[in-house]
Amino acid sequence: MLFLRFKFFNNRLLFVSVLCFVICVSCKREHKEIKIKGEKATELKLPERPNILWLVTEDMGAYIPPFGDSTVVTPHLSKLAKEGVIYPNLYSTSGVCAPSRAAIATGMYPSSIGANHMRTNSFTKERGLPAYEAVPPSNVRMLSEWLRKAGYYCTNNYKTDYQFKAPVTAWDESSPYAHWRNRNDDQPFFAVFNFTDTHESGLFEPYGLREIETRLYRAGDTTYQWKNYGASHANNRMSEAETPQYLSKDTKFNIPPYLPETDLVKRDMWKLYNNIGEMDNQVGAVLQQLEDDGLLENTIIFFYGDHGGPLPREKRLIYDSGLNTPMIIRFPNKLEAETSDPQLISFVDFAPTLLSIIGEKPKEYMQGQAFLGQYKNKERSYIHAAADRFDAETDVIRAVRDKRFKYIRNYRPEQGYYLPIDYRERIPTMQELLRLKAEGKLNEEQMQWFRDVKPEEELFDCKSDPFELKNLANNPEYQNKLVELRKELDRWLTAIGDDANLPESELINKLWNGSNTQPVTSDPKVSINNGNITISCDTEGASVGYKIVTAGNKTSKTWHIYNGPFKMPLGSTLEIIAHRIGFKPSKAIQISTSDL
């Protein structure tokens, strides 16, 4: 679907949306400036303490109509874009989910807190290492905990994957049933819904949507029994015949030049877009709930992906195909509707921005900057990214990008780009690439990923070379830009304390302060004075959560954050857990009023 906009002499805007209900025969993924009404105004007047809704999808490149790709119709996202602002220059800090989600949760770069390897709790045993968690500084809290402290009801539905176990204080609810509808009526909310439809595993064969992807967000429906809650992504698939089809299998796809145009690849492209169609359907279900509740114009709605696309040579890499993900924000009363904000935005900017939106000053430890709200910063000049271990395979790459150029530093130039990652090799396109490589049938652009070695430095003009295939690092005409971005990368590495060459074993030793075992949060201590309960914990930076079970056996529906002394009803029982991020949580302590 293409958006056409015209401005008339009476300054009224006519929005004409051309919906393609007939399957297009030559759909094309555009890599050009989006034709829209104009750029967003410098300042936005936002309501005080608005509700905030995040709609987060996985493995999402710019494969949707608001960003120039009309292959599959997405009526709900297209409407959201029509009523909101599109952000074409959002970049994840990594080309894979867990490190990127760590950045979102903390406002810190993954490589500054030990969250840069994919994942900290898997594929370590095979390398003779223990499973571990990222350990940020002691003053770091999850973004949602800061919002809870500010009075927000915070829900997550339901993926976490932060590279550390979330403290009980992080969310009011985190489950497939988590929903803003469970809050007190007078309470603002921050609600996160994670859509898994577009994950790379959705390209595996046999194809079919999984139960986790067909729920249409049954949040709040506690009578529904989940078959797949907590189980493998791949379980409980419907057959392909049962799976809804959002576009014809005969659709002609604009396949990126780094992939071959074979029937298997075309089928994966069809699955990719079909999954987007289902994701859009689920987004629409959540938005309908918001509208049904009369909350649409009191809520700032974010839609974005957790990194770039799912295909080989996209996910896990720090080319734009792996980092760039579309974002749409709809503001109450359609403020700045149908505009684009071209500023560079990094995932580390989300945490300070949300605090800024609700009038809270961003925390000093946060390495990002606010791009909206009371504490909005001037636009950033660069975004930064890193790639390290993925499952059982390791590389070390760092990158910096401005609005046009990207600089990549390869710390292992003797090693090729391609890594034989078992999970990725379940994708038919990956199997096809390997088959054609073995047969000598890949062209020069497709073979670049399979080079035996790679240059120490790469420089790409992302405007003229959006697929990053032409390295300009040795071109004399671009030496000034090369030096500029090289210096910026060095500055960034020093600023965040990223020792790119640090072996993972030494990283773990550093996170654990020289110990061979993961640190444990001290058990909380409780005292009472004049009827007031006081809780403390000897572990610096530990969050303390508590629940009260009354004499009538009624339990708090959520874990409260301990902020200071409080009174406890007679005959009740107190359950307490202390937890510093990256440490193991304390034991759960239970104390009744009769014990005090």
Curated annotation (Swiss-Prot):
The catalytic residues are: 97 (nucleophile)
Q: Which SUPFAM superfamilies match?
A: Alkaline phosphatase-like (SSF53649)
Q: Name one GO cellular component term.
A: periplasmic space
- Give EC number(s), comma-separated: 3.1.6.-
| Position of the signal peptide | 1-27
Tell me the compartments it is located in.
Answer: Periplasm
At the top level, the lineage of the source is: Bacteria
Instruction: List residues modified as 3-oxoalanine (Cys).
Output: 97
Q: Which cofactor does it need?
A: Ca(2+)
Instruction: Please give the chief subcellular localization of this protein.
Output: periplasm
Q: Which residues bind Ca(2+)?
A: 58-59, 97, 306-307
Enzyme class, first EC level, given as a word: hydrolase
What conditions trigger expression of this protein? By rhamnose.
Q: How is the cofactor bound?
A: Binds 1 Ca(2+) ion per subunit.
Alphabetized InterPro entries for the sequence:
Alkaline_phosphatase_core_sf, Sulfatase, Sulfatase_N
Keywords, ordered alphabetically? Calcium, Hydrolase, Metal-binding, Periplasm, Signal
PTM note = The conversion to 3-oxoalanine (also known as C-formylglycine, FGly), of a serine or cysteine residue in prokaryotes and of a cysteine residue in eukaryotes, is critical for catalytic activity.
Pfam families listed in its UniProt record = Sulfatase (PF00884)
* Any one GO molecular function term: arylsulfatase activity
What family does the database annotate? Belongs to the sulfatase family.
What this protein is reported to do is described as: Sulfatase involved in ulvan degradation. Ulvan is the main polysaccharide component of the Ulvales (green seaweed) cell wall. It is composed of disaccharide building blocks comprising 3-sulfated rhamnose (Rha3S) linked to D-glucuronic acid (GlcA), L-iduronic acid (IduA), or D-xylose (Xyl). The sulfatase desulfates Xyl2S-Rha3S, product of the degradation of ulvan by endo-acting alpha-1,4-L-rhamnosidase, to Xyl-Rha3S.
Q: What is this protein called?
A: Ulvan-active sulfatase
Task: Please give the organism.
Answer: Formosa agariphila (strain DSM 15362 / KCTC 12365 / LMG 23005 / KMM 3901 / M-2Alg 35-1)
Lineage, uppermost ranks? Bacteria, Pseudomonadati, Bacteroidota, Flavobacteriia, Flavobacteriales
